[in-house]
Amino acid sequence: MGSDKTSQTRCRMSEASSGALLSPNNSNNVYSSPSSSHQSNASQETFGSSTGNQSDASQATFVSTISQEKEQLKWDADKELKRTSKMLLKMQKWSLLIGLLTINGVFIWIAFQYPRAYYFTVILLTANTAFQGLMILCICAVAFYTHVLSRLWRKKVARPETSESLVYLLPCYNENMEELTRSLESLVIQKNVDPNPKFILVIVDGNVKGPGMTKTTQEYLLQDILGPGQFQRFHNGYRAHDGLHMPVDIQHGTFKGIPYLFVGKTHNMGKRDSLCFARSFLYHYNRRSEDTETIFNKDLFDYMGTLLLQAGMEKVDLLAGMDADTIFDEMCIHEMLEVLRDDPALAAVCGHVCVDYDGNPWGIWSMYQGFEYSCTQGLRRTFQSTVTGKVSCLPGCCQLIKVCEETFGDLILRERFGYCPKPNDMMTTQIMGIYSEDTAHAVAFFSLFPKTRTAQALRAKAFTIVPQNWKVFLSQRKRWSMGAVSHHFTMAFRPGILWIERLLALVTVATWAITPFTIAAIANVIIAFVKDSNHLWHDAASLGLFALLAIIYVSPFLVLNMFDLMLTNVF
């Protein structure tokens, strides 16, 4: 009953309100009803009921199982930068691949669709080969000039009165005990360098095991090869390539009469980081840098400097670099020294890298890579050494570099060679920051110091172990090709580079870019031989072309190997 009365009262109040609003003088009129007493009673009853409900609700509680989010920004700038940079790199990679495939596809289609177009395509296919032929002619011309003409008025070069001090650098990663022992032994047995003060610096990048190894490379060196020595750990050794501090283990002693310093890095940061460590240390040691910011912890820097002083080295003149899978010929260091002494303007010299056949001279893998070394790396380095004086790749497995501003200064090591790519850098910059550190170093000081010159010592032979299976071979060639092509592409547009080097760099990049087209052209030649071999054998133009190609490809091998003695006597 109470609820019925309440509803009736609310309806009447609503009607009264409507009537009052509709009245033209609603402000002066008062609405009254006989049921006003019922309204008052109903209101009191309703008020009493709501008061009871509020009293019950005040005693209730609400319990949930939710949890609040952590206090943090809605997005992480570092993560977003890395994600965006990774996406941009993928876009660049796929754009390059699609572009190269499109270009090669068009060339292949033109070559097969329009046979007369070979007047154009032959230029692309033979550009690199033509330059190889030009290199051989230039080498022979310079050899004739040097060997026959200039001997009449050649001046004697003043030799240094005191023997140059040498530091042997051996960067390692995951080499086994046999490789490490062979490399160190080849340094110890070097001939005709006895008067020179010598010091061995071994840097191990991380503490890892290679395939089939029972110990890490650091353990092999410390426990089995170098023997006992004074050991010390520096928790804050130096600032690594990525900008963070690197803990290092240090041991020094004597290895077969030569003082050594072992530096074991806790984490793997790459060979470039190890090279920056050694080169920057020697540069600042020679300068006796004071009040200068370096990558080194002061305690570590002073500790290593003390070891050099105790070894009788007031100053380090030359740094000889090699790889832990390489062995030097017993006259290697001496031959590189002779080239440097003959031309004091040289900043660095590299040796002649040969394949280590390891008792199997007829192995297919070794024979092919030996021929490849001669036709590609050896020929170009000989041309650069004798004609331009700018060997653009000083192989890390055999090099001798002067410790000076042009080679090891902060401008080179910290801003160019030691540059750590940012996540949003271009793809070529990322590649150059990882691969081909040998080319990166030479190109950097050629660009910043255009008058710097380098050379190759053909008699300074180093023997390196080459891959013996497809997996390792393709992995190595991937690193080499990506690094070399990126450096050659940028070298073509950098200041301070000779015009002939720019042209050679562009030809190298173009030859790499049309590799699928080259393979298709070779396949087309094979098909033509199969279909119409009789006609080709009787065609003078075809025979002449094949003979010329054979001469150009075989001659580098002959020049650098069969006539090696003659060339080294000349140069």
Locate the predicted segments by residue.
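Alpha-helical transmembrane segments and immediately adjacent membrane-interfacial amphipathic helices
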Residues: L100-I103, F571
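Charge-rich interaction surfaces and accessory domains that mediate macromolecular binding and assembly
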Residues: T84, G99-L101, I110
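Alpha-helical transmembrane segments of polytopic integral membrane proteins
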Residues: G133-C140, V403, I519, A523, ...
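Select subsegments of transmembrane alpha-helices in polytopic membrane proteins
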Residues: K90-L100, T511-T515
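Membrane-embedded multi-pass helical conduit in multi-pass membrane proteins
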Residues: F107-Y119, I123, L504-F571
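Non-catalytic localization/regulatory regions flanking kinase domains
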Residues: I66, L88-L89, Q113-Y118, T129-F131
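Non-transmembrane catalytic domains and loops of membrane-associated enzymes and transporters
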Residues: M1-T6, R10-P24, N29-S36, S43-T51, ...
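Transmembrane alpha-helices and immediately adjacent membrane-cytoplasm interface residues
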Residues: I123-S150
